[in-house]
Amino acid sequence: NDGIPDIIEAQGIPVTLLGTDADLDGLDDVFTTFVTPVDSDLDNVPDYLDLDSDNDGVYDLWEAGHPLLDVTLTDGQIDDVDLNIGINGLDNRLETAPDNFILNYTISDPDTDDSLFSYLDLDSDGDNCPDVTEAGFTDPDNDSIIGTSPTSVDNMGRVTGISNGYTIPDTDYSIGAPILLNTPFEDVAFCEASTSTISIDSTADTFQWEVSSDGGTNWTSIIDNTTYNGATTKDLEISNLQLSLDNNQYRVFLQRAGNTCNDTSNAITLTVEPLPTVTALVELKQCDDDTDGFSLFNL
């Protein structure tokens, strides 16, 4: 009762009935070859019986993409399903007509890059931030599975022994907001005493520049002052560059709405080129031994 037909959950791919039964076995010919139902998360509960087929702490019902929600009991089953279930076992509100088995919605697959429906995809929106994190749940070992592995589940496929999960999820898990660099972030070199700008070209919408003066061991968040300007923008201006900044490293902490994970850019190195040294003027004297007013000499 999660709103996803068992015929789809059995293999995790769309299945279209052929409408024929050549061998008269009572089954549509699409089932001529028996296929064992898949268990995507290997928890011994097949997907068609599993309320969380990928163990990310988000019910399949929420990840399915249909409009029928589970807000009353938050048990992973459609609210009031018993009042609307059809003869075929599917909620009539999800069909174009009762019991015609034609869905009036498309099963969610927002990233479309891995052939996985959202209810099977640990990163449904493809933004390199796991669903469990973006949904607002806890994954201490960062394996994209809710809780700490190895996991245990109940008879409905829900992970047990966890501190949260299986409540209404934050919506970030379904909003594709990857944090990327549009162009390489590379080392820079500027002249001493100049006012110069380092820029980062990223899909992020929030920036915090950081600096390290010890080879990247320790980092400090930059604030705007007489030396720096634009510490929370994509362009960091450095005024009156001093040789003391030579070999400093810079990086940017990046955030984007819709991506809970955030990211940090690679570090780049600043080279400060010293101004040329001007020596004192030297007076040169040369004898003109032939009194023609011209004389050759080497500098």
Annotate each predicted stretch with a short phrase:
Residues 183-191, 279-292:
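Short, solvent-exposed loop/edge segments of extracellular or virion-exposed proteins
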Residues 231, 242-250:
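Solvent-exposed loop/turn motifs of extracellular immunoglobulin-like beta-sandwich domains
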Residues 271-278:
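Extracellular interdomain linker/stem segments of modular secreted and single-pass surface proteins
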Residues 1-180, 290:
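Extracellular calcium-associated, cysteine-rich motifs in secreted modular proteins
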Residues 211-240:
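Surface-exposed, flexible coil segments in extracellular/virion-facing regions
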Residues 255-261:
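Short, solvent-exposed loop/turn segments at the edges of extracellular beta-sandwich modules
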Residues 200, 209-211, 250-252:
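Core motif of extracellular immunoglobulin-like domains
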Residues 194-202, 292-299:
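A short beta-strand segment in extracellular, disulfide-stabilized domains
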